[in-house]
UniProtKB/Swiss-Prot annotation:
Membrane topology: Single-pass type II membrane protein
Protein encoded by which gene: Wscd1
Cited function: Sialate:O-sulfotransferase which catalyzes 8-O-sulfation at the Sia-glycan level using 3'-phosphoadenosine 5'-phosphosulfate (PAPS) as a donor, forming 8-O-sulfated Sia (Sia8S)-glycans. Displays selectivity toward glycolipids such as GM1 gangliosides.
Source organism of the structure: Mus musculus (Mouse)
PROSITE patterns for the chain: WSC
Record topology, Cytoplasmic segments: 1-14
UniProt effect for mutating residue 360 to A: Markedly decreases the expression of Neu5Ac8S epitope
Sites carrying sugar chains: 105, 254
Name of the protein this chain belongs to: Sialate:O-sulfotransferase 1
Amino acid sequence: MAKPFFRLQKFLRRTQFLLLFLTAAYLMTGSLLLLQRARVALPQALRAPGSLQALPVATVALGVGLLDGRSLRDPHSSPDLLLDVDTLRSPLARLPPGIRWPRRNRSSLRRRWLHHLTSDPQGPPTLSPEASGPANHNRGNYLGCFSEEGQERTLKGAVFYDLRKMTVSHCQDACAERSYVYAGLEAGAECYCGNRLPATRVSLKECNQECKGEKGSMCGAVRRLSVYSVGLQQPGSKKRRTATYRGCFPLPENVTHTFSSSMTQANMTVETCSGFCSQKEFPLAILRGWDCYCAYPTPQFSLRDAVDGALCSQAPETQGLPGYCEVYQTPVQDTRCTDRKFLPDKSKVFVALSSFPGAGNTWARHLIEHATGFYTGSYYFDGTLYNKGFKGEKDHWRSRRTICVKTHESGRREIEMFDSAILLIRNPYRSLVAEFNRKCAGHLGYAPDRNWKSKEWPEFVNSYASWWSSHVLDWLKYGKRLLVVHYEELRHSLVPTLREMVAFLNVSVSEERLLCVENNKEGSFRRRGRRPHDQEPFTPEMKDLINGYIRTVDQALRDHNWAGLPREYVPR
């Protein structure tokens, strides 16, 4: 009996030594693999390959410029805790295939919408072309440090922000694209363009903030501008914008009084006239024979009475009439309505700018900000919009420092927080397409064909169509004081509708400022280029569903003493 016991004891001792040895070998092997992986990952992170593979969690948390490849070039980014970018980039990742949105659970749907908003695949802003490498300071001279404290900005032709990736060349490219001569950088993340230098030069030491995206380069300070000349554009940069033909118009009675600047030259061309007016920062170049005039839109020359282009023709066989002129839009922005600020005192009336997603809320904010001169706020935070100049995005939505607050929320509690609201309504067919494009391709992109053909599109329509209806119905029911604005009316009759909106906001606006807004009505928020998907995306079943919601909303508007929906909404 004792002999088998001793054999068992001997076997167990050997097993203990064997397990201890295997455990030590396993730990050593794992440590070696981790060290090897760390050595390989570091040079890969520094090389920043063109095809993105992963994003730091910190980048995802910020929600600004998520899919911009340049954010991976920062060697200080944490290499651990990485997320798969393909997962972030894919619209299907936002809602897994097979999962249908609950029709009745509106709060759940809105939470999903807000989550997708911060992971917008939109690239860098329109005014910030991709920088292909580090800043090249030889392309433009550094002109010094300037102060614009206590005075109106001189460099205000174009403005954009980038809290994480601003560089000198980034700003220079943006200004060059719009034919400006000078690029000024402020507070490490702000870029201003113009053709005149600020008047007050200060010590170079006062421009002491590094560029957010370029260590070692100075990008001004608070109310201090590091100013560079733009110089020649680099290969791969966006081409300079050219003059855009606006039409043929009658010459005003008093040309000298109406047009601020002029030049006469033999064989005058559009390029020469546009360049002359751009240098003087005028948005309009007017051409008549050998005469070139520069001007702003005014009540005397409002660009609303265009005539047949043959009356302005320069061809010998047509011989245009002397009382008409050709008008071109220069690349320069009309600066009479670009200055914006926060409200000097907290607003006593808390106003919402409410709409269904895809109904043109961002465009309406652009119009309101430039018409009133005050920033608009947002219930959400969208870094892409902040980079395009919506400074109110960073302000807390309940600060009451903005003229109104963007929201897509509905439901009694959310609505009754506001004292009044502008309710922006758009044709649901167009709203659904616009929001689907934004979800799949960003604010200015188009959803690829594969998204339209997938299950995602019918699931999107089934859930979001009912939200379009419930959003309007809730605001009509619980809103304390409303102004109903239809997107189509705002586009077709911009100045009268916008005048009604600013009056509702209790702001006095001059006619010239409204004309300035009309002259730059699109801003940077319209999708450019040809739509890649021109086929009818709505099936008969989808149309039956949407048409039912249209009838419901149309009747609700009439029941609340508002005009019904525009005729183009109502199914025939």
